[in-house]
Amino acid sequence: MKLIYSEEAVDNLRRFDPVERQLIAKKLRYLAENFEALRGTKKVRELKGTRYPDQYRFVIARKIRAIFRVDGDRLVLLILRIGRRKDVYE
């Protein structure tokens, strides 16, 4: 699958230090390569009660999450937001 970052996700990513950015990039590449295997596990869950269907969250680290959407027609993961667990769901 191809990864595409929203403008908000890119801005979110800039707030992390370089070591965390490398970890996030590595984990998101792993997600893109293994999405079907990870779907429905504790690491990747579909979000409920959101405005848009097919939104998921991905646990990158203990306190870091990514919110993303799957565009099934093009096999694309659109990364919507990246942030600390306490802030990313707002």
Which residues are covered by each model-predicted region?
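Basic, Lys/Arg-enriched alpha-helical interface segments
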Residues: 1-63, 70-77, 87-90
